[in-house]
């Protein structure tokens, strides 16, 4: 595999990165393998006129080949030094809208006027899961997402019931999105090389989920409780929330372990909790 510092197509176009040291507090690992970069951009398949948003462009390894195909790109970067470099980049600055911000604090619905957002990035591993759940709040405005993540996280996102990787993020993300791992990325593709394998995943929010649920916040809260102690049964983990006989009425074995329940199972329990809490609130209001 040939290596460079984020692409040398423009003969000096990426020189702007020189001298930047990866910052641990931002979880920075910079992609620098041309072959892997091309595979990732092919998977994204950016086209002119699309509402493309890159999170954490870093040294522009994905930014350059993406904007070559799309002509324009929004980038969200928290690191002030990298923002300045991108704003003064001799080849990219005119094609970029650079937003200095923490992606976790951004309301992505503000970009919806320009069409469904296509979001991608080599995410810092320390914010990857919170950021995905943050973006799912704006799923109606997002066409798809392509993220570089730890392979372990991608395995969890795509895991099926019964596997050791299956957990709360599997349920939360699969309820909202089609999940497809698309590119495997070795540590050698980064500077500095991380200690873990990486993978790029494609997340496509459903227009209509095959796993409908009335309250996603309720579902996420339920999964947090259910998977808190994986070795215990659902009866045990949810005893403060759902009576065992109610689980049976929903077609769920109370003696099952949390990782054996399907996404639909969790959605049914969540909907019962939503209805149950509404009923209790109505009864409380009537008694006042």
Swiss-Prot record:
Task: Please verify whether the record's keywords include Metal-binding.
Answer: no
> Is Flavoprotein given among the entry's keywords?
no
Query: Keywords of this protein's UniProt record, alphabetized?
Result: Cytoplasm, Methyltransferase, RNA-binding, rRNA processing, S-adenosyl-L-methionine, Transferase
Q: Where is the composition biased (Polar residues)?
A: 1-14
E.C. designation(s): 2.1.1.182
Task: Enumerate the InterPro entries for this protein.
Answer: KsgA/Erm, rRNA_Ade_diMease-like_C, rRNA_Ade_Mease_Trfase_CS, rRNA_Ade_methylase_Trfase_N, rRNA_adenine_dimethylase, SAM-dependent_MTases_sf
Annotated PROSITE patterns? RRNA_A_DIMETH, SAM_RNA_A_N6_MT
What cellular component terms from Gene Ontology apply here?
cytosol
Compartments, as annotated in UniProt: Cytoplasm
What is the uppermost EC class here?
transferase
Annotated S-adenosyl-L-methionine binding sites: 29, 31, 56, 77, 102, 122
What are this entry's molecular-function GO terms?
16S rRNA (adenine(1518)-N(6)/adenine(1519)-N(6))-dimethyltransferase activity; RNA binding
Q: Which SUPFAM superfamilies match?
A: S-adenosyl-L-methionine-dependent methyltransferases
Q: Which reaction does it catalyse?
A: adenosine(1518)/adenosine(1519) in 16S rRNA + 4 S-adenosyl-L-methionine = N(6)-dimethyladenosine(1518)/N(6)-dimethyladenosine(1519) in 16S rRNA + 4 S-adenosyl-L-homocysteine + 4 H(+)
HAMAP family per UniProt:
16SrRNA_methyltr_A (MF_00607)
| Assigned protein family | Belongs to the class I-like SAM-binding methyltransferase superfamily. rRNA adenine N(6)-methyltransferase family. RsmA subfamily.
Q: What does this protein do?
A: Specifically dimethylates two adjacent adenosines (A1518 and A1519) in the loop of a conserved hairpin near the 3'-end of 16S rRNA in the 30S particle. May play a critical role in biogenesis of 30S subunits.
The name on file for this protein is Ribosomal RNA small subunit methyltransferase A
Organism annotation: Idiomarina loihiensis (strain ATCC BAA-735 / DSM 15497 / L2-TR)
């Amino acid at each position: 595999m040939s290596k460079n510092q984020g692409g040398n197509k423009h003969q000096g176009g990426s020189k702007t990165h020189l001298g930047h040291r990866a910052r641990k507090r931002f979880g920075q690992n910079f992609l620098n393998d041309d072959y892997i970069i091309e595979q990732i951009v092919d998977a994204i398949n950016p086209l002119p006129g699309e509402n493309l948003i890159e999170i954490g462009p870093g040294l522009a390894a994905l930014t350059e080949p993406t904007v070559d195909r799309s002509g324009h790109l929004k980038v969200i970067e928290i690191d002030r030094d990298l923002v300045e470099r991108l704003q003064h980049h001799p080849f990219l600055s005119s094609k970029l809208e650079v937003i200095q911000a923490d992606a976790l604090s951004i309301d992505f619905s503000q970009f919806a006027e320009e069409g469904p957002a296509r979001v991608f990035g080599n995410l810092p591993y320390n914010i990857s899961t919170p950021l995905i759940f943050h973006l799912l709040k704006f799923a109606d405005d997002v066409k798809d997402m392509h993220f570089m993540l730890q392979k372990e996280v991608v395995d969890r996102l795509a895991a099926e019931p019964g596997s050791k990787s299956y957990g709360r993020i599997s349920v939360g993300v699969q309820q909202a999105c089609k999940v497809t791992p698309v590119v495997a990325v070795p540590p050698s593709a980064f500077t500095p090389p991380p200690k873990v394998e990486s993978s790029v995943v494609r997340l496509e929010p459903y227009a209509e989920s095959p796993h409908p649920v009335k309250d996603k916040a309720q579902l996420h809260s339920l999964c947090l409780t259910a998977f808190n102690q994986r070795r215990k049964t659902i009866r045990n983990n949810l005893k403060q929330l759902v009576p065992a006989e109610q689980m049976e009425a929903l077609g769920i074995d109370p003696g099952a372990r949390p990782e054996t329940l399907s996404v639909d199972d969790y959605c049914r329990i969540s909907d019962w909790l939503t209805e149950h809490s509404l009923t209790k609130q109505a009864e409380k209001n009537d008694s006042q």
